[in-house]
């Protein structure tokens, strides 16, 4: 079936005629397949005497050329061109993608490592795991991805605050530079501690070393992450010796999150909001806050 489809002579209007090196014409099924999967280069569709063919121009020159009928052009469609390019630099990724956490280690070390090696940020599913298990995951992932992006989930645990505190302590101890904050109904001292402990004054401004991606489904929670840390949590962190006074002062100039993941109705617990309504609402809220404060938080 595939062979007959590929050999079909398309009745498409000719865009023009072009000279193509004979050696670069792909007219076999496996060659066509390889060309169409190459998203990083433009692919030219040709109506050759033998049927549909493709051509990816190279830098080489050849005297053995055939004049071909050009019927279409597939432009570059590299995944690296999709999304907000501003996501890639701070998160050290190739792609503006984030693979969110799945609890109890379902988003495993192996998954985080495999995606990280391809330049994609993924979160380890730390929710539901004790701090010692999280520590083992940190060590394994850091060994495999010494210079690559990765993140760890930080889930709000109102009934077991020790788990939230223990996770943050491990993240700070091992230098985990990005957490995905989920299930928060409000900010807590633990998430504020993680964020603010990574603030430093530099000649160029404020350096943020601890990144936060907040997964939210309610606008009132989104607002908490789009704005700076509240004074009451900063005071708690200062009283416990978790942050310095300088870091508390710097916290007034940065939002709590670098990125928001808008969580619409899905297979797990959500607030049953359809994405077509929730996403524009979150974007509107972000824009309103940015108009009043010099912050830039990405939303996806």
Task: Annotate the PLM regions.
Residues 1-300:
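Active-site entrance/lid segments in N-terminal catalytic domains of soluble metabolic enzymes
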